[in-house]
């Protein structure tokens, strides 16, 4: 069509064409009709009716084309339409067959037709619309032109046709109506009440109706017009072109539909919104939005009135029926009158002139304006109605913008409407339009089926609203039709407006069914159907009954795009049942009976609800107070709510994380009160039991008891421990651990196995206190396991396995430990000597220990620990007992035993908890050397001791040195700050020592079953050398090795156990560890280095300590780099936790070395100094005039000395780094 149009008249030459057309056609009738058309057209042109240029401008804007192009295109369309009109008119004037008409058209060509701007315009519009989808922007421009041309042509053509085939008055009225409607459409478009596409669709519908009715042989004329519109067979025989054109037009429309779907949807949405406010104006609104309803009504009513007047009975009934039937009177009437027209066409032009007139009137697009006016006014257009109206107007072809969809629907609607109305014309129309193109018929059937489906579904949802609107429509004269149209109307709104309604409605719900609907009749109906299904289906039945993975409360309103059919509309406070939580962040859930997607950022997951289902059930089972729903609830019950901020700040927001809490975590969280620690650990155990044991009620009970004990300080029996006495004494589970080690062992094993995975979560524990507590508990457990191994294997195993479950191991009170102490002869080794003695007992196990450690690290620490504990207990019972005693003493006498505890802790740490970290350092620094190992162990122990006394601070610092500290803490039940996270990290990374002292400790204990693994294996992940060193060291330090051996096997000393092999070395390492942490911290303070600031810690708490700084500190403090790195990270973590910031322990030296620790882009002198580990000279060099990076290469020994740097090693470092320094592309002055 475009080509034809372009060929016909690239430039607007309406007049020339008009003249030939007039010459060709009976001039009188044509001139009369044309004169009327031109009057209307001129009214539009002169602005009285509206400005065509405005419309053209809008089209130009709409299609992103030049105004001139649009005008040209419109002119071309107009000319084409004129030629078509001439062709049609000729057939009309002398009723001829389609062939005759097509022949005439061919002979006449487009030029032969009288140029009726209206007719042409309409055709062009039609054409342009149909072309819109398939044509490019250029086509669109042309379309715009055609739109205007069609506008005029249609009007003129209608006049001519009417004059020819019908009374001029009728024609005039028809034309007037079309003009009015066009003006209204233009005004509506101008006012943005409707989109250009909608206007085009209406014009097309009008044209189609027009052609059908205006042509004496409606079928012929419409066919001709259709071909013309298609432009595929403009000069070809109209018959063939009609069928083919119809098909092609359909497809073009479908294509266009797809293109215009978005706009149509938007329109529909707008219309829907308009329609919602005024449901009664629906019919009129089909063409316009509610505001324009009156105008449209006037336009349509004007046209309609005329048709009614002229056709009186035939058209009116159809219109009434159509109106009532169709949500949009115009569309229904169009369909009806279109059908009538086609019927007329089908009949003979001459035969059905009376009919034709009525159909024409109806076809006059505005034939039913009067009726419609009332109807329109009475009800607001529904978007569906609007679409219908447009579709019926375009009647299958005319609607190019939503066109195809609308047309098919309108056809169906029209058919249905007319059928109910009992219109022959409708049937004929259907036949004429449908029968020629098989595809159309199939589409019609599809549309019908879709409508049926949509009606069924949507009627339920929208039955009330739609019925109201429909009632307005149905209220119209044609009630019979309205009954059916009502449902159809419902369907239509669903298909079209429904889509839009849905999209509006669902746009609220985040689902827009419209998007699919307008794409194509079938597609749109299908998508509509689907969307309706999801929406309507929800009302009918829950769309999803399957399992939910949780619930979430919406905290932020979210209204999805109307094109987003999958998203849910979220309103604050809505509770969404989560169906799936993909990692991408777009979750799926059920809300308001609609399954859709939503972004997790808009909701708060209700952990309580997710976790509660199990717990509540358990609680109910127990009949005791329900299980706590949140950490806050839990802490409230155990009267420890003062720790709530600590837990929340450190990542223990939910019970799943909280139940991973361990003693070392308590240490890190700086929760040092033994009672609090015991209660917390007991609560953790109970939570774990709830989850792991079917007898959750018992666990709950224990929890309650534990809480009671805490609050009432009354003995509590967790049920895990054999003696309530132990629980009483320790309120931690140490006594019970010893007594119930065997019983808890299995539980602990299960916990341990499940916990290793949890440890990573534990590391989340942000509070140094919590970690320390956990560590202490673990140490206690670890020591207890060691002790138990020596004396009480089952107890030890239980302790190691039940780290969490066995807060007992942390026994806060000496009594608790003492209770179990009897297990072994070591009554309470307060001093390292005692521990050493124990170690001696376990001397034989040193190698075993290291092996265990290595295995444990790789394996799940807990499991291994359990096994190891079992294995070691035989040979290490005494040592374990001593360890336990020491721990119990420490727990019972934290202050006085502090030193002893530290020693014990050191031993314990060496054995199970601290050793992991210490060992890695020692291993790395002095892997083969026993003394080195011992020293490291001792350092770690000292650190652990320091941590215990220091509290979280050291514990936190000890996160890197946490291996030692934490290990120690566990045994002494003093909290080394290394978080459980670290231990896990170690296991996961294979480097347990530095990265996660806690984790290694736990893993080692747990991994003790892997005692066969050599110490080197244990540390091997991170510091294989230390492990090896430990092995040799273990034998050398006979006493320590037993401890270590015990720990590895029972608690799987973990890497550190190997490290700590010798008790003496442990003492030394303990002392050194404690001293090293204090020394490191003091040195950092003296140098003004804040490890909590960038680049040492990023905003997420990750470690960024430069390797150069670690190396320098190792040199300055004459300590192994590994120990220094661990201590520095522990200090960093401790400080971060004190600030209630996130703290992620690093993997220690190996991790630091793995990633360049330079601040990244060195942009200033300060950055450079930080990267080389000498940040304290920033101000010194700045004062000396070295403030920019460009001056770095010029640094010299004398300059540095003059600047006041006296440390020779530092000067050498600075000069070396300055020589290696390369200026960045754009250095910035500091």
UniProtKB/Swiss-Prot annotation:
Basic residues composition bias: residue spans: 615-624
Composition bias type Basic and acidic residues, residue spans: 275-297, 485-494, 768-779, 940-956
Cell compartment(s), UniProt: Cytoplasm
PTM annotation (Phosphoserine): residues: 83, 241, 400, 813, 831
Tissue expression pattern: Expressed in the microvascular endothelium of various organs, as well as in parenchymal cells. Expressed in the endothelium but not lymphoid cells of spleen and thymus.
Keyword check for Protein transport: no
Keywords: Cytoplasm, Phosphoprotein, Repeat, SH3 domain, Tumor suppressor
Biased composition (Low complexity): 1-10, 324-336, 498-516, 1008-1019
Region (Required for interaction with TRAF6): 844-852
Pfam families listed in its UniProt record: SAM_1 (PF00536), SAM_2 (PF07647), SH3_2 (PF07653), SPIDER (PF12485)
SUPFAM superfamilies named among the record's database cross-references: SAM/Pointed domain (SSF47769), SH3-domain (SSF50044)
Residue segments, region Disordered: 1-30, 211-249, 275-337, 439-566, 610-633, 705-792, 818-875, 915-1045
InterPro entries: SAM (IPR001660), SAM-SH3_domain_protein (IPR051725), SAM/pointed_sf (IPR013761), SASH1_SAM_repeat1 (IPR037627), SASH1_SAM_repeat2 (IPR037630), SASH1_SH3 (IPR035720), SH3-like_dom_sf (IPR036028), SH3_domain (IPR001452)
Domain SH3 stretches: 547-608
A biological-process GO annotation: regulation of protein K63-linked ubiquitination
Biased composition regions of type Polar residues, renumbered to the chain: 461-470, 517-529, 737-758, 852-868, 962-972
Role this protein plays: Is a positive regulator of NF-kappa-B signaling downstream of TLR4 activation. It acts as a scaffold molecule to assemble a molecular complex that includes TRAF6, MAP3K7, CHUK and IKBKB, thereby facilitating NF-kappa-B signaling activation. Regulates TRAF6 and MAP3K7 ubiquitination. Involved in the regulation of cell mobility. Regulates lipolysaccharide (LPS)-induced endothelial cell migration. Is involved in the regulation of skin pigmentation through the control of melanocyte migration in the epidermis.
Subunit structure: Interacts with GNAS. Interacts with IQGAP1. Interacts with TRAF6 (via C-terminus); the interaction is LPS-dependent. Interacts with MAP3K7, CHUK and IKBKB.
Entry protein name: SAM and SH3 domain-containing protein 1
Organism for this UniProt entry: Mus musculus (Mouse)
């Amino acid at each position: 069509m475009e080509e034809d149009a372009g060929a016909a008249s690239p430039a607007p030459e309406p007049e020339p064409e008009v003249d030939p057309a007039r010459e060709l056609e009976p001039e009188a009738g044509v001139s009369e009709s044309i004169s009327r058309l031109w009057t209307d057209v001129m009214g539009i042109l002169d602005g009285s009716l509206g400005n065509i240029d405005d419309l053209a401008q809008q089209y130009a804007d709409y299609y992103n084309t030049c105004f001139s192009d649009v005008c040209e295109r419109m002119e071309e369309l107009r000319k084409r339409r004129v030629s078509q009109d001439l062709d049609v008119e000729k057939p009309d004037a002398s009723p001829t067959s389609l062939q005759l008409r097509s022949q005439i058209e061919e002979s006449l060509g487009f030029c032969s037709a009288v140029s009726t701007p209206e007719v042409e315009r309409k055709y062009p519009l039609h054409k342009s619309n149909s072309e819109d989808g398939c044509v490019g922007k250029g086509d669109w421009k042309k379309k715009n032109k055609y739109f205007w041309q069609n506008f005029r042509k249609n009007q003129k053509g209608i006049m001519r046709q009417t004059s020819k085939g019908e009374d001029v008055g009728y024609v005039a009225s028809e034309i007037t109506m079309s003009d009015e409607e066009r003006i209204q459409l233009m005004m509506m478009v101008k006012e943005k009440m409707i989109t250009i596409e909608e206007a085009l669709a209406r014009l097309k519908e009008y044209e189609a109706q027009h052609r059908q009715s205006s042509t004496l042989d409606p079928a012929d004329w419409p066919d001709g017009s259709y071909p013309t519109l298609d432009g595929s067979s403009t000069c070809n025989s109209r018959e063939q072109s009609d069928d083919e054109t119809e098909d092609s037009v359909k497809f073009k429309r479908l294509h266009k539909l797809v293109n215009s779907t978005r706009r149509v949807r938007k329109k529909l949405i707008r219309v829907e919104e308009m329609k919602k406010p005024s449901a009664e104006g629906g019919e009129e609104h089909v063409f316009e939005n509610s505001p324009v309803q009156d105008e449209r009504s006037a336009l349509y009513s004007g046209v309609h009135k005329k048709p009614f007047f002229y056709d009186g009975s035939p058209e009116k009934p159809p219109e009434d029926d159509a109106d009532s039937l169709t949500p949009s009177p115009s569309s229904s009437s169009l369909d009806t009158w279109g059908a009538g027209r086609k019927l007329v066409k089908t009949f003979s032009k001459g035969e059905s002139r009376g009919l034709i007139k009525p159909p024409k009137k109806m076809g006059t697009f505005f034939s039913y304006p009067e009726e419609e006016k009332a109807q329109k006014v009475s009800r607001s257009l529904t978007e569906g109605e609007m679409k219908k109206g447009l579709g019926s107007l375009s009647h299958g072809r005319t609607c190019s913008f939503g066109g195809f969809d609308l047309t098919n629907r309108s056809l169906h609607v029209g058919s249905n409407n007319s059928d109910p109305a009992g219109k022959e014309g409708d049937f004929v129309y259907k036949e004429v339009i449908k029968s020629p193109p098989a595809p159309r018929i199939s589409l019609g059937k599809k549309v019908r089926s879709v409508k049926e489906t949509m009606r069924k579904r949507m009627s339920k949802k929208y039955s009330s609203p739609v019925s109201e609107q429909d009632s307005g429509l149905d209220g119209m004269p044609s009630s019979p039709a309205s009954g059916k149209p009502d449902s159809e109307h419902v369907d239509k709104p669903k298909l079209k407006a429904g889509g839009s309604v849905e999209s509006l409605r669902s746009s609220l719900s985040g689902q827009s069914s419209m998007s699919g609907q307008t794409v194509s009749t079938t597609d749109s109906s299908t998508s509509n159907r689907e969307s309706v299904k999801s929406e309507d289906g929800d009302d009918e039945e829950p769309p999803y009954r399957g399992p939910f993975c949780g619930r979430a409360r919406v905290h932020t309103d979210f209204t999805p795009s109307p094109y987003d059919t999958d998203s849910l509309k979220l309103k604050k406070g809505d509770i969404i049942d989560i169906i799936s939580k993909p990692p991408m962040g777009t979750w799926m859930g059920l809300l308001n009976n609609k399954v859709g997607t939503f972004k997790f950022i808009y909701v708060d997951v209700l952990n309580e609800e997710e976790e509660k289902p199990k717990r509540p059930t358990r609680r109910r089972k127990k009949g005791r107070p329900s299980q706590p729903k949140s950490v806050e609830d839990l802490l409230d019950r155990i009267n420890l709510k003062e720790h709530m901020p600590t837990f929340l700040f450190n990542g223990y927001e939910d019970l799943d994380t909280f139940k991973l809490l361990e003693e070392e975590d308590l240490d890190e969280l700086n929760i040092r009160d033994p009672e609090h620690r015991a209660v917390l650990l007991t609560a953790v155990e109970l939570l774990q039991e709830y989850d792991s044991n079917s007898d959750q009620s018992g666990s709950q009970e224990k929890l309650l008891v534990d809480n009671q004990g805490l609050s009432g300080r009354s003995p509590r029996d967790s049920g895990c421990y054999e003696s309530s006495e132990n629980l009483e004494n320790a309120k931690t589970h140490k006594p019970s651990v010893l007594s119930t080690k065997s019983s808890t062992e299995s539980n602990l094993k299960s916990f341990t196995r499940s916990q290793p995975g949890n440890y990573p979560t534990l590391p989340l524990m942000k509070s140094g206190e919590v970690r320390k507590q956990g560590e202490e508990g673990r140490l206690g457990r670890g020591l207890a396991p060691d002790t138990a191994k020596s004396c009480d294997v089952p107890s030890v195993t239980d302790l190691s396995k039940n780290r969490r479950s066995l807060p007992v191991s942390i026994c806060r009170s000496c009594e608790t430990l003492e209770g179990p102490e009897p297990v072994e002869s070591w009554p309470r080794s307060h001093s390292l000597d005692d521990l050493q003695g124990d170690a001696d007992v376990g001397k034989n196990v040193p190698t075993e220990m290291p092996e265990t450690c290595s295995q444990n690290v790789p394996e799940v620490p807990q499991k291994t620990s359990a096994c190891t504990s079992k294995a070691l207990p035989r040979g290490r019972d005494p040592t374990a007992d001593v360890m336990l005693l020491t721990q119990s003493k420490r727990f019972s006498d934290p202050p006085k035993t502090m030193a002893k505890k530290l020693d014990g802790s050191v031993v314990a740490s060496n054995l199970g908890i601290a050793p992991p970290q210490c060992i890695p350092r020692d291993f790395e620094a002095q892997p083969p050397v026993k003394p080195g190992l011992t020293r490291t162990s001792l350092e770690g122990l000292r650190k652990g001791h320091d941590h215990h006394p220091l509290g979280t601070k050291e514990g936190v610092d000890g996160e890197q040195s946490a291996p030692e500290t934490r290990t120690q803490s566990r045994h002494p039940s003093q909290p080394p700050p290394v978080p459980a996270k670290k231990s896990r990290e170690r296991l996961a990374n294979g480097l347990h020592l530095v990265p996660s002292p806690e984790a290694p400790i736990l893993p080692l204990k747990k991994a003790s079953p892997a005692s066969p693994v050599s110490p080197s294996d244990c540390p091997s992940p991170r510091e294989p050398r230390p492990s090896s060193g430990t092995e040799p060291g273990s034998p050398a330090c006979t006493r320590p090795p037993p401890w270590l051996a015990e720990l590895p096997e029972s608690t799987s000393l973990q890497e550190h156990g190997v490290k700590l092999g010798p008790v003496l070395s442990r003492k030394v390492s303990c002392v050194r560890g404690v001293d090293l942490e204090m020394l490191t911290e003091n040195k950092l303070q003296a140098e003004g280095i804040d490890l909590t600031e960038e680049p040492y810690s990023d905003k997420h708490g990750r470690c960024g300590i430069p390797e150069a700084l670690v190396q320098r500190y190792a040199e300055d403090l004459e300590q192994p780099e590994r120990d220094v790195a661990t201590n520095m990270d522990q200090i960093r973590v401790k400080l971060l936790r004190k600030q209630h910031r996130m703290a992620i322990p690093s993997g220690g030296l190996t991790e630091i070395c793995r990633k360049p620790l330079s601040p990244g882009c060195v942009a200033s002198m300060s950055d450079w100094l930080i990267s080389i580990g000498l940040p304290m000279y920033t101000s010194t060099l700045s004062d000396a005039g070295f403030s920019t990076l460009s001056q770095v290469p010029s640094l010299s020994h004398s300059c540095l000395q003059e600047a006041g740097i006296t440390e020779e090693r530092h000067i050498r470092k600075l000069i070396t780094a300055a020589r290696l320094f390369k200026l960045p592309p754009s250095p910035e002055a500091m």
